[in-house]
Amino acid sequence: MDWKHDLYKKVAPFIRSDAIFATNTSGLSITELSNGFTSELKKRFCGVHFFNPPRYMHLLELIPTSETDSDVLDSLETFMTSVLGKGVIRAKDTPNFVANRIGVFSILAVFAEAEKYQLGFDEVDAITGSKLGRAKSATFRTSDVVGLDTMAHVMKTMETNLQSDPFYRIFKVPQVVQTLIDMGNLGQKTKAGFYKKQGKEILVFDGANYVASTGQIDSVVERILKKPINERLELLRNESHPQA
């Protein structure tokens, strides 16, 4: 937040009176970011949240404050959809907006379950990807794509602002994420995070070192996942295997 405020102080005097001023943030309050602006600039300020990698990710969140001019939003949405080909949703100025509020909650919930049942990161990804109707990047590969430093900022926003949420107890940066950040392993952009490619081999972080990735779905759980969906959930609930 402070970094952005410092930057805004430097650029604000040079912003044309007909220019739209937009910020890309993963979840910081757009209203708080506009503190210190003139009333006229506040009308032309909003959040525009792209998703990584923006070249391929269709979703874009458009986040106004209570003072953003509706014409500004309409113009931006038209440009984003017709020129950039994005799928735009208008989000409220709440912590982490829509996608990260849901997505990072989902990742943190998986972290908690993985720790509880002592499951490896590659093992969890084998379970939480296409087998659950999600992207093949699943949980921890997705985290690597997002960037662990970026994801940690989103998690801290949840920890700071969502004390009344019933799942607040899991809203914190997991120790393993902090460990990887301290190592400088931020995910795909540093070529190492939860996963690391060494030659043709994919390695996975085990909490201390990178080891060969061998995670796969147990045959018991695999058989259940092939059942009709109306039977699948009950069978998983009744199965004692940690993956279930």
Roles of regions detected by a PLM:
Residues M1-A244:
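N-terminal glycine-rich phosphate-binding loop for ADP-containing cofactors
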